[in-house]
Amino acid sequence: MVELTLIRHGQAQTGAKDEASYDSLSDLGHQQARWLGEVFQEVEPFDQIISGAMTRQIETTQSMGLTNVPHSTDARLNELDYFGLAESLRVRQGIEVPRSIQAFALHVPQVLEAWRGGDVTENLESYDEFCSRIMGALHNAAGLDGRIALVSSTGVIATLAAISLGLDTVKKTKLFLRVMNTSVHKFQLVGNDLHMTQFGAIPHLEQADRAHARTYG
């Protein structure tokens, strides 16, 4: 039985209209990661950190400041292509890309339902391909020695949680919308069975004066 720690990246460029504009940490995102790194320095250290290959995931790892822990990247931990899926939904079903937080909350289940049902343009990664690659990343990490942390994104973490709990798309959407920036999640692999043992911990943001840093962007 192997336990893996997954961390969502810090706050990125909220309000961005495309992946390239979104994919870097805000000043607050760097601060969130620094605070989390301070917590990790006080507990049993990780033996290795593996992040996705996206800029926001790499910057989160770097800003945690755990310089004595080896860091490598695995693109299988990259986020799903939400902007691409949203554009596919617009083209195929005429559903416009949301411009507000409220509209986004309604848009997510529409995107995930279309994606899971295969109603997306052919150039996009399928839902099954996405699940296969992120589970492959977990199995790879589980085969390494020591305590391993994985720095990834909302879609990856919410999907793993949904797989472990056997959730449908509607319930998965609720998870997707509640994965806080730099939150900490834990999963155990028992053979091929995935079990979630912790969801959404924020030990570095519990103080009252850090309430402003509890973000989802």
Q: What residues fall within each predicted segment?
A:
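Generic beta-sheet signal
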Residues: 4, 144-152
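Loop-to-helix element that buttresses phosphate recognition and phosphoryl-transfer chemistry
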Residues: 4-62, 125-135
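General small-molecule cofactor/ligand-binding pocket signal
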Residues: 5, 72-74, 197
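Active-site metal-binding loops of divalent metal-dependent hydrolases
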Residues: 10, 154, 200-202
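Phosphate-coordination/substrate-recognition cap region in phosphate-metabolizing enzymes
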Residues: 35-109
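Glycine-rich phosphate-binding loop signature in dinucleotide/nucleotide-binding domains
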Residues: 42-45, 141-146
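Acidic, low-complexity terminal tails and accessory targeting/binding regions
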Residues: 78-100, 144-147, 162-217
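Internal catalytic-core helix/loop-beta-alpha segment
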Residues: 109-144
